[in-house]
Amino acid sequence: MTYAFDPLVPRDIDRPSPVDVTRPLDEEASLAMDEAKIFAAPADPAERPAWRRRLHEWREDSRRRHAYRGERYAHPDARWAAGCSTVAQVWLWDELLFDFTAQRFTPERLVEDARERFGGLDAVVLWHAYPVIGIDQRNQWDFYRDVPGLTDLVEDLHRAGLRVFVDYNPWDTGTRRGRDDATELAALVADLGADGVFLDTLKKADPELVARLDEARPGIVLEGESKLAVARIEDHAASWAQFFADSDVPGVLRAHWYERRHMQHHIRRWHRDHSEELQSAWLNGVGVMVWEVVFGVWVGWSARDSATVRRMVRIQRAARELLIEGDWTPLAPLADAAEEAGVYASLWERGGVRLWTVVNRGDHEWTGPLLSGASSPVVTVPGRGIAAVAEADDESPDWWPGLARAIAEADHDRDDDARFPHRPARRIAPPALPRDDDAPDPGPGVDLPEGPYALTVRYRARETGMYQGAPYVDEWKPLPPRLHDARTLQREGLLAGRVRVAATEVTAGEFRRFVEESGYRPLVPTRFAGDEGDPDAPAVLVDLEDARAYCAWRGGRLPTEDEWQLAADDPGFRRSEPAVWNWTESEHSDGRTRFVMLKGGSDRGATGSDWYVEQGRQSADYAVKLLRPGLGLGRSTAIGFRCAWDLDENVAPHEEER
């Protein structure tokens, strides 16, 4: 197969835009500059004064053309966004934020981890539905509304000093329909007390949606994905600078140059080296999105990049007034030796204070005079790193001592370890539940012999990946056919003893009998199977723990995903009506995300978007990686289960994986 693009290099739309200073800034040239993500910088220092003048000319002209007022940024409830240096996108069920054993949120763990490694967060996006949505007819609002204690979680995060974004998925049109999206989102924002809305896949919100959200939460901060149109900087206080490629000599972010109070968050979600994003953020006085778990995949930041964030935000927070209101000189003149070493700086000036935010594009540490002249300060800049130099006149503002202290502290906080912090997913041994020795005979099933096996597993390449590792590494923008295409993997293992897999799924009537006779009560009853419905239909609205408990009551256990597949090839293996996905004993965790493998496919589910979990009956060799939600949200009308029994005594119940 020949790909139409190289995923390891930026696409044309990701690249910085050159600035033509050889002709007057007419309407055509000004409109062209409106479309930039980053204004590319000239390599020749002699060309930079004209380049800076052109940036000023464009900003003045563009603001005139768009009749810019900037009222959004003056709103008391929106001002915080201008100082939001770090935002983290966090899956609600990230194991830093949620304890699966206790079934409770643990915001204190998330906050402490971020403080130690990143210098603390300013905001979080509570990601909720994707990539689980589509497994059944629940819509994106259900995946917030059904969460017990979500309002308490938001309040806890607020008490910890963090702002909270909720996520809006405009592509969710194939699940159950309720009220229109604007009504649902506005109500959610009001009920949770959310500070902002992250606009998934949207560069900007419709004006009507903005108005509805403003009614629910005056001053609401909207953050779109990717490039924000100049005209909408007026009512979007932040934007997501995703996959913004910089020029070799660092350039200027167009949206932030247009409005210094507009916060942008750099992010290249699949990259393992974030130094270029961090340097661009540092030189432009903006922030970054710290995103270490991308839809269930670990993409953790290196110790070097984490330390860079700590150093950066310590100074940015101390210098916020200077960075927003001071005079900004991009690519300020430096000593020739610094320029030759690939060292560049922005200069920020206000109230007799001068701050140089410095970056080193080279791979090796550089030490030398920053400026021309004998009185120049000497600076050390780590390879691929940042530094800061500041000086003040005798009459300095009251924030100057805090800034000087922050710079001194940052100088002692660095780490040169740029290795990727791998985090393998491990299979979780199921809890040892008491089995009923008097349970009736398992009944009809498919008997699997002991011994080795090899399987081919088919799956769709989603952003969730499969068992280990990220599906994309250092890729700019995964697109079809790299995204959502059909793939295979091979699994090898050993059955240590004979296993019988039930011929059919457990029925709703059988599960009700279990609940009545055993007195079983789940730790969290949210969405737990009710007493109504066809007793001969497959049991649904059962979580993994519920299914395990039932099978133990029957003297068995859940089959592993491999046992399920081996049995499903036998003519005696049957599917119930309607078909539902089957839980398997395949729970894994990398310490941040829990997932299982579903088998079988379902007659239920959502259609209309590739972002949904696939629906429809699937072949025996097909698998879906499902991220585990907590607090009962794993209970689905489209997921049932069947049991398995070990036919030989004193045999470990699970196969070895290789």
What do these predicted regions represent?
Residues 110-206, 519-533:
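Aromatic-lined carbohydrate-binding/catalytic grooves of carbohydrate-active enzymes
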Residues 149, 156-159, 172-240, 244-249, ...:
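Active-site neighborhood of glycoside hydrolase catalytic domains
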Residues 396-563, 568-569, 621-658:
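Extended beta-strand/loop cores of jelly-roll/beta-sandwich
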Residues 586, 591-624, 633:
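Alpha-helix capping/hinge segments and adjacent helical runs
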Residues 1-122, 379-382, 393-439, 649, ...:
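Mature N-terminal, pre-catalytic/accessory segment of carbohydrate-active enzymes
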Residues 43-48, 52, 217-219, 223-369:
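Active-site-proximal substrate-binding groove within the catalytic cores of carbohydrate-active enzymes
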Residues 88-92, 122-126, 164-166, 196-199, ...:
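Structural recognition of the beta-strand scaffold that forms the well-ordered cores
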